[in-house]
Amino acid sequence: MGGVRAVAALAFAGVVGLTFLVLGCALPRYGTWTPMFVITFYVLSPVPLLIARRFQEDMTGTNACIELALFITTGIVISAFALPIVLAHAGTIANSACFLVNTGSVIMFGTIIAYFYLHRDDDSGSWSQSLF
């Protein structure tokens, strides 16, 4: 039953994160949907690590493939937080909309991290190899 609760908690956290994102766009006070582009970063953030885990070589010491994937993932995550800040600085969105979108990003990326943490021991071939 613990697995069902974990999946339900992850789903709820994802819904809360997306709710903050939609609130930052849809409230009449803000009136612009440009922060919705952050969803692109949510989708792209796990891709480099998934690819790196799939093609990981057995090497002693550090692994360049994993390090490159972590670097690219870090760039994607920072871009997800930077986009609303740049839009707010340019005057495209309000500062409060930027706060709502970045709050949603914190929750969504926390959900993505929790998903990979909870499913790290699944027996699915090389996809289940630990990254850290």
UniProtKB/Swiss-Prot annotation:
Function: Involved in endosomal protein transport.
One Pfam family in the UniProt entry: Vps55
Organism encoding this protein: Caenorhabditis elegans
Superkingdom to which the source organism belongs: Eukaryota
Compartment annotation: Endosome membrane
Keywords: Endosome, Membrane, Protein transport, Transmembrane, Transmembrane helix, Transport
Protein name: Vacuolar protein sorting-associated protein 55 homolog
Lipid bilayer topology: Multi-pass membrane protein
GO biological process, one term: protein transport
Lineage start: Eukaryota, Metazoa, Ecdysozoa, Nematoda, Chromadorea
